[in-house]
């Protein structure tokens, strides 16, 4: 056993200080370039195990070797000839080439869908349409946000007191502004300024008082309301 291990180590370390420099060990083929070293490799694979072999090693960012363990039957260290190349050299860092093509196709399809969405929905995020806000037609269509400070605000509509009644929409209540002088002239003309106690102006108050007084007068034996 010791002789076989020494022969194996000699065959592995003859090309460098460690066995990682050997091309056959790096590729995980289980073969050596020289046919004289084939019996030592066969003995080494018999000692390693019967049900697993190591796939190709990969070097990560820390320059450390990582092997992917592939389960299966090992016949003298050589992988089965009927196995697929992807399963023979399986590695978590090396994906098959058809997957890259599928990812590229999926990316192109996603980009196409995004272009169609943005074509039909020009304002997908804030759902802001400048045509519905006439203030932006004066200040520019690129202004999509309003200033929070009313003193420096340019997107806010002007004050109602400075807008004539003709420019306001017809559906707005109290569009006709009444001057105080006109109102006082109407009060003087109707003589309301001489009346100290104005009558009840809300609807139903007089009728309610009449019914209450009538019921109380018709039934004097009862306590009046």
Swiss-Prot record:
Organism: Xenopus tropicalis (Western clawed frog)
Job of this protein: Transcriptional coactivator or corepressor of the p300/CBP-mediated transcription complex. May be involved in sex determination, early gonad development, left-right patterning during embryogenesis and differentiation of the adrenal cortex.
UniProt feature coiled coil, ranges: none
Name of the protein described by the UniProt record: Cbp/p300-interacting transactivator 2
Lineage: Eukaryota, Metazoa, Chordata, Craniata, Vertebrata
Similarity field: Belongs to the CITED family.
Keywords: Activator, Developmental protein, Differentiation, Nucleus, Repressor, Transcription, Transcription regulation
Gene3D superfamilies (UniProt xref): 6.10.140.2200
Segments traversing the membrane: none
């Amino acid at each position: 056993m010791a002789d076989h291990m020494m022969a194996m180590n000699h065959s592995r370390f003859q090309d460098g200080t460690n066995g990682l420099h050997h091309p056959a060990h790096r590729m995980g083929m289980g073969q050596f370039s020289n046919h004289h070293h084939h019996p030592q490799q066969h003995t080494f694979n018999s000692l390693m195990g019967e049900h697993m072999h190591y796939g190709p090693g990969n070097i990560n960012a820390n320059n450390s070797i990582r092997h992917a363990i592939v389960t299966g039957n090992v016949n003298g260290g050589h992988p089965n000839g009927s196995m697929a190349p992807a399963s023979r050299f399986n590695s978590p860092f090396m994906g098959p080439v058809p997957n890259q093509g599928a990812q590229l196709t999926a990316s192109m399809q996603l980009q196409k869908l995004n272009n169609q969405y943005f074509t039909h929905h020009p304002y997908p995020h804030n759902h802001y349409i400048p045509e519905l806000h006439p203030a932006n037609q004066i200040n520019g269509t690129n202004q999509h946000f309003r200033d929070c400070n009313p003193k420096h605000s340019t997107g806010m509509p002007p004050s109602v007191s400075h807008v004539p009644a003709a420019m306001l929409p017809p559906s707005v209540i109290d569009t006709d502004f009444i001057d105080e002088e006109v109102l006082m002239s109407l009060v003087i003309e109707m003589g309301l300024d001489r009346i100290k106690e104005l009558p009840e102006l809300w609807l139903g108050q007089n009728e309610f008082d009449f019914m209450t007084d009538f019921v109380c007068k018709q039934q004097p034996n009862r306590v009046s309301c």
